[in-house]
Amino acid sequence: MATGAPIRMTTAPRPMTMTMTMTATMTMTTDVLTLSQLLSPSFPVGAFAYSHGLETAISEGRILSAPTLQSWLMDLLEHGGGRSDAVLLNAAFGAADDLVQPLDAHARAFAASAERLRETDLQGAAFCETVETVWGIALGRLCYPVAVGRAAAILALDPELTSAMYLQSFIANLTAAAMRLVPLGQLEGQKTQIALKQHCAAIAKQLQGATLDDLHNSAWMSDITSMRHETQYSRIFRT
């Protein structure tokens, strides 16, 4: 008995699968849009006024070019303020209500200098005030990464995406400061951010579910420049 060519059976995607895929895509898109607003330079936390000690590092000749800036920022992401902020953000995201204030106190105690404490406190206070006014979410007064993590949890945002975009915002703000101080051109600034993009994503992924046990810092030169900035004679940034 002759047999013809095999009959290819095709099945349309199940309606439930399509619905779930569309819902997940829409949720992720909404998360991106919400985080783009929360972490935008236009969000009134005054991020433009803080250099995280970068101003002193530049004035002392430690950062003179795009490559030296990129190296400095990489250290912050892997060993310094960027990483520790991401740890605190994720710890706040997963914290029970009664543990948020102790976590915030720990974050404040972890600040390496008076200016670092001021930087995280004032940005956090402004963030909390704006979130309460716009979204009706009362966060109290929390330092910046704790406030962002807490708001993201309440708004049911994706924690890994929140961490990655927070780190990208952190890098973008310091790059903008360096563009004014070194100075660097706008194209060099954009290339620096692109070079660090994958590191932001990788660190965000690595720190999912992080707790205070994961908190550490070994970017000591950044901490020292932050301390020196307090007595720097001529400066345009608050930290």
Q: What spans do the regions from the language model cover?
A:
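Metal- and O2-centered redox machinery and metal/ROS homeostasis
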Residues: A2-T239
